[in-house]
């Protein structure tokens, strides 16, 4: 084992250090995710997907597919860095309330932006239907996911903080298995409920259960970041680990595409959101793999990169 490497302690409960101030690289990573969403949605909304040539989709909608996965991963990372070490403290109820108030704020802006998105194209009755969760919009739905997640994630943070590593990894595996099983159910024909929980192919929204594993992976990365970020050698190892994992996942996507016999078709399928709702293997390998690579680059750049890309960092700090 290389020097300074610590063996994994599968049964030990985490003893997390308190954060040493705001980590600008996290804001930068979130800002990159939001920036990619803006590029993707601007083309969809202003140009229209039908008006974009097939291979015009690849540099725009193919490469921007990292955005939602990066946003969700950074959500978990930020919670770990800012809140996880405080879950056993006396002021945890106040911190939890802060997250819930943030959920209300995000939910308000989600609904306000939903009206703005739908107003030019839909009659009032359909907009009201969307406001009452009778249907979903498109471009603002990541905010709807974010608002709901901010309600339940604070409830499980104390349990997560007390769980040994094997329990946390088992939880991620169990949620993936639960998602696969729930995807096979019809939910009594209630497509909206299915979409909110595990995604539905006819609705452009992120399921809370189907995307929960990414939040929890973000928590694990956030724990590692707390231990590594302010030690240059450890941070370098973390960056290389994330970069390698991301590259392997993207390579896995291309291996599947090559095995299918038509790599360009596989790339166009991802660009056209095939496998996004509900999550499919190829899409998730590419999206999460790319997100991990972008995250690694943001962490490698650290405060200097955050300062050089200040507009993105500012966007990420306010999200």
Segments the model singles out, each with a brief description of its role:
Residues 2-319:
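Alpha-helical transmembrane segments and their immediate juxtamembrane cytosolic regions
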